[in-house]
Amino acid sequence: MAIKIRKLDSTSEGFAAELRAVLAFEASEDDAIERAVAQILADVKARGDAAVLDYTNRFDRLNAASVAALELPQSELEAALEGLEPKRRAALEAAAARVRGYHEKQKIECGSHSWQYTEADGTVLGQKVTPLDRVGLYVPGGKAAYPSSVLMNAIPARVAGVGEIVMVVPTPDGLKNDLVLAAALLGGVDRVFTIGGAQAVAALAYGTQTVPAVDKICGPGNAYVASAKRRVFGTVGIDMIAGPSEILVLCDGTTDPSWVAMDLFSQAEHDELAQSILLCPDEAFIERVEKAIGELLPTMPRQDVIRASLEGRGALVKVRDMAEACRIANDIAPEHLEISALEPHQWGKQIRHAGAIFLGRYTSESLGDYCAGPNHVLPTSRTARFSSPLGVYDFFKRSSLIEVSAEGAHTLGEIASELAYGEGLQAHAKSAEYRMKGAGDRQKG
């Protein structure tokens, strides 16, 4: 059966509206899910371990006697790594090493060190940078088991110097994924609990008798997990609420069309709502990509998901030239942006908004997903206009440092008291003036 993908032309009169229709996505809030999540959060907050145990046994069809029994010992993570097929273990270890190397470099470059300077009057100003004390990592279980996500979330936290990393992962019917457990070991996870869903998010946010409360929760999950993360934000920090995965390919028509087709598939196979778009100035090349899609789709194990994604949210777009493609890309602000062209750096300089930029025909998005090194946790749904990939900087916090000298107390006090009186805050003004007087008396003495 032929696949039907939208084909747009940027020179057509209705192009802007057509593109908006392709991009339109708004995460719907299911009232039933919202009510269920609110109840679970309240229950875990009130009953702690007992509630977590009840929900876990019910939803994952387990018969655990306690939450403590749901914690995995480090020896089980070690056994999972040892039990991997050698080639797969080597791949996982290589990916972990590359991700760690990139984030160690990022730590040096991203302003992760405290700093200060001294003014002429002896006043010291600066900033103290400290890692978070404890971070929670949510990892999906069941069919959607992604060891790469464990590495991408755990390693930057560990490189940042987070005190403790607590991972939660559901194990429906008691089934554990050895790749996920091995990734937890390689990523430096300290504790692993086999719990999931909104109850796991609640346990991490509020703490229970067994599960420690964390300062920030990271990691992907289903609609219940996303709703729970949204609701606990403020009690704890969160990484982001991710939407469907996206790829935008800018191609000048010089890449093998089957490569481009497979790159579009690489996001479409995630789920039916994932989005894959091609922008190209060469109409004949677009037709060749369309032909490659038709030929390659039947060979894909997840062809039904890919078809639904491409037909529902995909597009092949003819643009005037690569410069226009860059302008459109900046408006879309995609999660993943591939520039598959002879001169990728020329066009890359024009990109301002993208979660990750993949330069050149040999740089497939999938390499970034697994092992290139940069983080694959990226902003979606146009949030790349103001958001960044997950990184070591997400696991630091900054405190301002102020140490005022006696002379500085007089200089700054005059400014502060004047502004405080202007705002009608007399105690603020007096607080500054007392120190002005105290500093003056000390200097006289």
UniProtKB/Swiss-Prot annotation:
Q: Does the keyword Protein transport apply?
A: no
Its keywords, alphabetically, are: Amino-acid biosynthesis, Histidine biosynthesis, Metal-binding, NAD, Oxidoreductase, Zinc
Q: List positions binding substrate.
A: 245, 267, 270, 336, 369, 423, 428
The catalysed reaction is: L-histidinol + 2 NAD(+) + H2O = L-histidine + 2 NADH + 3 H(+)
As recorded in UniProt, its EC number(s) are: 1.1.1.23
Associated pathway = Amino-acid biosynthesis; L-histidine biosynthesis; L-histidine from 5-phospho-alpha-D-ribose 1-diphosphate: step 9/9
The residue stretches assigned to a coiled coil in this entry are none
Record's function text = Catalyzes the sequential NAD-dependent oxidations of L-histidinol to L-histidinaldehyde and then to L-histidine.
Q: Which GO terms describe its molecular function?
A: histidinol dehydrogenase activity; NAD binding; zinc ion binding
> NCBIfam families, from UniProt?
hisD
InterPro entries in the record, alphabetically?
Answer: Ald_DH/histidinol_DH, Histidinol_DH_CS, Histidinol_DH_monofunct, Hstdl_DH
Main enzyme class: oxidoreductase
The annotated active site, in chain numbering, is 335 (proton acceptor), 336 (proton acceptor)
Q: Which cofactor does it need?
A: Zn(2+)
Entry keyword Amino-acid biosynthesis: yes
State the name under which the record lists this protein: Histidinol dehydrogenase
Gene that codes for this?
hisD
Which top-level group of life is the source organism from?
Answer: Bacteria
- Which residues are recorded as binding NAD(+)? 138, 199, 222
Protein source organism: Burkholderia pseudomallei (strain K96243)
> By its UniProt entry, which PANTHER family does this protein fall under?
HISTIDINE BIOSYNTHESIS TRIFUNCTIONAL PROTEIN, HISTIDINOL DEHYDROGENASE HDH
Q: Which HAMAP family match?
A: HisD (MF_01024)
